[in-house]
């Protein structure tokens, strides 16, 4: 099943997409609700190697005119992670919903044997100034 705008709004518990950022931020601060919602997302889409909110945020929340918010296509994110290669420290200063860092994380973990890979070997830091994007970024991480 594909995560559509309607499904995401239902999982977050809202009727209109403009309510998503505030509602999601409240859920993130409640451990039980956060974990329950994450499991609900996983039941629909268990692929952790992509940004669940990429299309949703771009369609419903991006402010291209005022803040020049635009999203990196998955193909470019994958290419950049290959060009950069495995590295123990990673920084995205305009992370949006996290699609670049998700691809970097996926590339790093897939570049090693499952017997050698430890999440503690890598540090990922994301920065985002948009109050609307921040809850989606936090949920993705």
Please describe what each predicted stretch is:
Residues 1-59:
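A short N-terminal interaction module
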Residues 22, 30, 45, 49-51, ...:
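Acidic-enriched, low-complexity/disordered segments with a strong bias for Aspartate over Glutamate
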Residues 39, 59, 63-64, 88, ...:
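A near-ubiquitous, low-amplitude feature marking generic local secondary-structure context
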Residues 44, 64-69, 125, 129:
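Conserved aromatic-histidine-acidic binding/catalytic patches
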Residues 48-82:
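Class I SAM-dependent transferase core
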Residues 74-141:
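Conserved S-adenosyl-L-methionine
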